[in-house]
């Protein structure tokens, strides 16, 4: 259900409502930080994701867990929004709502999301180099990097910006050489 159009159709109005609340209270960046933390938690804890999306578990239990997870440092508006998702039985779409909110935030701040796959973890200098390259390619004011590691690349990086892919990996270069030699 993660990428289905139905889940997007359900998540989008909630994300827009949250964006509207955050804009009217000048909390867009703060909500963005809290939502990124929540997404990290959901991505690193399949148990939590399953717990929240399980229709058999009572709403009170889900609310209690969310209250504990979010703590007092989370803005009350965002906590109340999460409780609303539980009440409306839409908490199973939390991940999609969060992703959609971040997409709206990037659009608002002229920020582009760049998914970077590298053979090893990028150091600060390499990250900055990738950010500069993405800014040049996209014309965006800011870049949000989503980095992952794939040792099969051997070296280099693959950068995905929207539907555009820049393959600067050794594996990609070897594949292109293989294709050109195969055509001879």
UniProtKB/Swiss-Prot annotation:
InterPro entries reported for this sequence: ATP_synth_OSCP/delta_N_sf (IPR026015), ATPase_OSCP/d_CS (IPR020781), ATPase_OSCP/dsu (IPR000711)
Sequence similarity: Belongs to the ATPase delta chain family.
The species this protein was found in: Gloeothece citriformis (strain PCC 7424) (Cyanothece sp. (strain PCC 7424))
Membrane topology designation: Peripheral membrane protein
GO cellular component, one term: proton-transporting ATP synthase complex
Name recorded for this polypeptide: ATP synthase subunit delta
GO MF terms held by the record: proton-transporting ATP synthase activity, rotational mechanism
Alphabetized Pfam families for the sequence: OSCP
Domain of life: Bacteria
Disulfide-bonded cysteines: none
This protein's UniProt keywords: ATP synthesis, CF(1), Hydrogen ion transport, Ion transport, Membrane, Thylakoid, Transport
Subunit record text: F-type ATPases have 2 components, F(1) - the catalytic core - and F(0) - the membrane proton channel. F(1) has five subunits: alpha(3), beta(3), gamma(1), delta(1), epsilon(1). CF(0) has four main subunits: a(1), b(1), b'(1) and c(10-14). The alpha and beta chains form an alternating ring which encloses part of the gamma chain. F(1) is attached to F(0) by a central stalk formed by the gamma and epsilon chains, while a peripheral stalk is formed by the delta, b and b' chains.
Coiled-coil regions listed in the entry: none
NCBIfam families noted in UniProt: ATP_synt_delta
Reported function: F(1)F(0) ATP synthase produces ATP from ADP in the presence of a proton or sodium gradient. F-type ATPases consist of two structural domains, F(1) containing the extramembraneous catalytic core and F(0) containing the membrane proton channel, linked together by a central stalk and a peripheral stalk. During catalysis, ATP synthesis in the catalytic domain of F(1) is coupled via a rotary mechanism of the central stalk subunits to proton translocation. This protein is part of the stalk that links CF(0) to CF(1). It either transmits conformational changes from CF(0) to CF(1) or is implicated in proton conduction.
Subcellular location(s) of the protein: Cellular thylakoid membrane
């Amino acid at each position: 259900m993660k990428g289905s159009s139905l889940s997007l159709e359900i998540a989008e109005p909630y994300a827009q409502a949250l964006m509207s609340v955050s804009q009217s209270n000048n909390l867009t960046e703060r909500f963005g930080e809290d939502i990124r933390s929540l997404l990290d938690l959901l991505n690193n804890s399949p148990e939590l994701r399953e717990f929240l999306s399980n229709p058999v578990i009572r709403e009170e239990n889900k609310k209690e867990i969310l209250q504990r997870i979010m703590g007092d440092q989370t803005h009350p508006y965002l906590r109340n929004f999460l409780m609303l998702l539980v009440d409306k039985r839409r908490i199973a779409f939390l991940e999609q709502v969060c992703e959609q909110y971040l997409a709206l935030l990037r659009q608002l701040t002229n920020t582009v999301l760049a998914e970077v796959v590298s053979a090893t973890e990028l150091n600060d200098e390499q990250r900055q180099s990738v950010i500069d390259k993405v800014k040049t390619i996209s014309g965006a004011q800011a870049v949000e990097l989503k980095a992952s590691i794939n040792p099969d690349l051997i070296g280099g990086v693959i950068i995905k910006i929207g539907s555009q892919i820049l393959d600067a990996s050794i594996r990609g270069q070897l594949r292109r050489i293989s294709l050109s030699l195969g055509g001879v």
